[in-house]
Amino acid sequence: MKNWKTSAEQILTAGPVVPVIVINKLEHAVPMAKALVAGGVRVLELTLRTECAVEAIRLIAQEVPDAIVGAGTVTNPQQLAEVTAAGAQFAISPGLTEPLLKAATEGTIPLIPGISTVSELMLGMDYGLREFKFFPAEANGGVKALQAIAGPFGKIRFCPTGGISLKNYRDYLALKSVLCVGGSWLVPADALESGDYDRITALAREAVAGATA
């Protein structure tokens, strides 16, 4: 972690809402990122669920300097190296493995690994990590479960993701242990497909306003 250019905490505190994005067409990447930034959302998680995801990260990193673009669904050291080379400023994984944790601590961008149990949390802590993704948040018991997991670990911070929506995101943000939340509602698939970037900007503005109210 000594080579990380920035900390996971710095990334997550730039939230408070991180859109979890699935890009199917490369031409959507830059206008979508600009639309989110215009709405006050700068930290973007592009999931590695499609073939063009890495190139989309590269384009956003090059063409939208106000965005803090990272990679989601990073599951192995090879992917971590690939997204780092593409210009990702952080990486998020759905879970954690020792090979991935080792690669992250030796790499140059912060990894925010997913955890759903205390044992997983403690493994990540053994590698020096202090910020984690609580995933899948709602399926794992939601706010009450996260409160229970976070209880013994006063210095650990979280970005809950999974089942988070406009209806419940403020409940998570109210927790002391939560720096930001991740959610897919900010970039609806139909808005992306139709090029309705004004709608994406409006959703971003709404989320930021609600988080800071």
Swiss-Prot record:
It comes from the Bacteria. CDD domains: KDPG_aldolase (cd00452). The record marks 161 as: Plays a major role in determining the stereoselectivity. The gene is eda. InterPro entries: Aldlse_KDPG_KHG (IPR000887), Aldolase_TIM (IPR013785), KDPG/KHG_AS_1 (IPR031337), KDPG/KHG_AS_2 (IPR031338). The keyword Lyase applies. It comes from Dickeya dadantii (strain 3937) (Erwinia chrysanthemi (strain 3937)). GO terms for cellular component: cytoplasm. Its EC number is 4.1.2.14. Pfam families: Aldolase. Pyruvate binds at residues 49, 73, 133. NCBIfam families: eda (TIGR01182), PRK05718.1 (NF004325). The active site is at 45 (proton acceptor), 133 (schiff-base intermediate with substrate). This is 2-dehydro-3-deoxy-phosphogluconate aldolase. SUPFAM superfamilies: Aldolase. Involved in the degradation of glucose via the Entner-Doudoroff pathway. Catalyzes the reversible, stereospecific retro-aldol cleavage of 2-keto-3-deoxy-6-phosphogluconate (KDPG) to pyruvate and D-glyceraldehyde-3-phosphate. GO terms for molecular function: (R,S)-4-hydroxy-2-oxoglutarate aldolase activity; 2-dehydro-3-deoxy-phosphogluconate aldolase activity. Pathway: Carbohydrate acid metabolism; 2-dehydro-3-deoxy-D-gluconate degradation; D-glyceraldehyde 3-phosphate and pyruvate from 2-dehydro-3-deoxy-D-gluconate: step 2/2.
